From Swiss-Prot:
This is Cystatin. Keywords: Disulfide bond, Protease inhibitor, Secreted, Signal, Thiol protease inhibitor. InterPro entries: Cystatin_dom, Cystatin_sf. Negative results: the recombinant protein does not inhibit calpain-1 (CAPN1), a C2 family cysteine protease and legumain (LGMN), a C13 family cysteine protease. Does not provoke cell death (PC3 prostrate cancer cells). Inhibits various C1 cysteine proteases including cathepsin L, papain and cathepsin B. This protein has no toxic activity and its function in the venom is unknown. It may play a role as a housekeeping or regulatory protein. Gene3D superfamilies: 3.10.450.10. Belongs to the cystatin family.
Length: 141
């Protein structure tokens, strides 16, 4: 009798152990960590930097130093939650056509003593089927 219970006991113990492990599956509508090198995250970050520069009253452009953290949430589309470091550049905003992301990233940084770094939190909402992306929240300090 004991011998016949062993094949059932082992899978049952395994199932119980798996149920006790923390869940690593994505919760629909919940936040999920994302790799900062993910192409979708990179696209959202580029958009956030460009929007930051368009909306800020700074006289100089700020460029992306790095993405500190990235998370996403499945909504109607995808919402990206980004924490990024931006640095003031030597490129002045002038009247005329604003610089695009790649041009901003090529701007030189001022000497170390004059550098201004910001840590910004952005929320970017992407709906590719509508060809729409928007910055829904931004805070920098």
């Amino acid at each position: 009798m004991l011998h016949s219970q062993l094949p059932v006991a082992a899978p049952l113990r395994l199932l119980c152990a798996l149920l006790l492990l923390p869940s690593v599956t994505m919760i629909p509508g919940g936040l999920s960590p994302r790799s900062v090198t993910d192409p979708d995250v990179q696209e959202a970050a580029e958009f956030a930097v460009q929007e930051y520069n368009a909306l800020s009253a700074n006289a100089y452009y700020y460029k992306q130093l790095r993405i500190v953290e990235a998370q996403s949430q499945v909504v109607t589309g995808a919402k990206y939650y980004l924490t990024m470091e931006l640095m003031k550049t030597k490129c002045a905003k002038t009247t005329g056509k604003p610089k695009v992301y790649k041009e901003i990233q090529n701007c030189e940084l001022p000497p170390k003593a004059q550098q201004e770094k910001l840590t910004c939190r952005f929320q970017v909402w992407s709906r590719p089927w509508l060809e729409k992306i928007e910055l829904t929240k931004m805070s920098c300090n």
